[in-house]
């Protein structure tokens, strides 16, 4: 069975996995739930320009890749919060993707938090945030690291915090769940729990927290995993999922591709072209994202429509840079080797 399409713009209809090319004018997208607000804005602008609706399925990027791999969901575009999830598409991995935005981690919190004053003090630099989240009764939320990159990035941040602040065992204490309390929730539900006060704070991307109207405590480098200059410092950290897949820490990046089982690959390419173009960049920047990136994988497999846009962007403003046969995403010995290789 197929998941219900979540409305991004236009009328939500049945599952996209049964759609065939030409059946309607909608573009189906499975995207990282942290992009929910930004994708609504993208969909609105895309519709104005093309007349086409965008139907979205927001969820953790690992979970979304599994649904596509298993044929449960057949979107025209897959957008991930970590390029390392691309090999999880299996036989539907086209062997290329375009990185179009970057982000960083923060601790997001709302007015309903029981520890509002302490969090405000941490935001102002008057208290250390680990001391705040370890207070008795503090409820810190995060996403499932087996389903969502933000989940394993939170673990990386806590491990780095232990190295920066000490003492030994700090990360384990932050990750521990008090008796009868849950700390791990689906990405698409996390902000609502923070806004209502059922969680005092949670790990978010900066743009995501801003879009949801949350306050935030900034995290220092490299804990925030937002600066490409920290790639080497992050690469030594890794997380192994319950099914044995290994993900390594890397600067946060969003990437988009057209799965090989897309019913309408041209529609998918058109939406990605919009994302990496001037108008798409403007929408993303208005939503708080840092735009720019590169082609990952085999450039020869990238649709000509996209190569035209990427090349134009490189010449015009440098937002997206095209490189001949760019280096593939290295997740070895994780989901698999280069983009385009299915996991075992």
How should each PLM-predicted stretch be described?
Residues 17-51, 55-65, 69-71, 82-83, ...:
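Exported/periplasmic ABC-transporter solute-binding proteins
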Residues 73-75:
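Short acidic/histidine-rich motifs immediately flanking catalytic phosphotransfer sites
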């Amino acid at each position: 069975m197929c998941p219900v399409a979540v409305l991004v713009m236009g009328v939500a209809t049945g599952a996209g996995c049964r759609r065939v090319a030409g059946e309607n004018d909608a573009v189906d997208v499975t995207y990282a739930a942290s992009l929910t607000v930004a994708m609504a804005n993208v969909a609105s602008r895309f519709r104005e320009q093309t007349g086409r609706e965008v139907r979205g399925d927001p969820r953790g990027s690992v979970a979304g890749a599994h649904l596509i791999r298993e044929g449960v969901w057949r979107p025209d575009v897959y957008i991930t919060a970590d390029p390392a999830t691309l090999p999880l598409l299996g036989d539907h991995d086209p062997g290329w993707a375009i990185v179009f935005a970057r982000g960083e981690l923060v601790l997001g919190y709302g007015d309903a938090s029981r520890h509002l004053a302490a969090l405000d003090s941490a935001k102002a630099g008057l208290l250390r945030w680990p001391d705040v989240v370890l207070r008795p009764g503090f409820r810190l939320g995060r996403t499932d690291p087996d389903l969502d990159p933000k989940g394993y990035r939170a673990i990386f941040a806590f491990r780095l915090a232990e190295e920066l602040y000490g003492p030994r065992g700090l990360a384990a204490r932050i990750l521990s769940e008090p008796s009868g309390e849950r700390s791990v929730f689906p990405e698409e539900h996390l902000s609502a729990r923070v806004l209502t006060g059922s969680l005092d704070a949670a790990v978010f991307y900066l743009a995501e927290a801003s879009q949801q109207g949350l306050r935030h405590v900034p995290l220092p480098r490299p804990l925030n995993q937002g600066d490409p200059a920290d790639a080497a410092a992050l690469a030594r950290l890794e997380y192994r999922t319950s099914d044995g897949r290994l993900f390594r820490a890397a600067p946060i990046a969003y990437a988009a591709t057209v799965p090989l089982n897309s019913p309408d690959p041209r529609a998918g390419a058109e939406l990605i072209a919009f994302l990496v173009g001037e108008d798409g960049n403007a929408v993303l920047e208005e939503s708080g994202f840092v735009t720019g990136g590169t082609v990952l994988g085999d450039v020869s497999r990238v649709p000509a429509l996209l190569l035209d846009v990427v090349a134009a962007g490189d010449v015009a403003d440098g937002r997206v840079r095209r490189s001949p046969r760019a280096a593939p995403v290295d997740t070895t010995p994780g989901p698999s080797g280069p983009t385009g290789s299915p996991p075992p």
